[in-house]
């Protein structure tokens, strides 16, 4: 059977194992694998921020998602990067934390603005994966 050419998943070798052959289909695109989750506070802001990293399965980069964007008094709107990915995990995490959040916070504080919880704007596309309580049988 011939598979039509086009935009389709091309598996990457991770070690000696071909990853995710289930995605080898012309109708599948944008496949990614969860890598890690990081939670932290920015300066004096009371909300916990979460950053998740994903390995793209058809591109050579690490994607990131943020639970919040930052919108200080120095900005017209909350900063949303147009390139939410890095070359590797370290690069992606530095971009998500340092460039997309902390630099804006530091600049506003340096210019005399008092941190306010309204500076962190929830990302409506970020899903919280809440753990369901487990019942314990005795």
Model regions and ranges:
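A short, exposed loop/beta-hairpin motif centered on an aromatic-Gly-Thr core
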Residues: 67-95
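Amphipathic, interaction-prone secondary-structure segments
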Residues: 34-68
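Short, mixed charged/polar active-site loops
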Residues: 46-48, 77-79, 120
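Short arginine-rich
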Residues: 98-115
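Negatively charged, low-complexity tracts enriched in Asp/Glu with abundant Ser/Thr
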Residues: 2-48, 116-117, 127-138
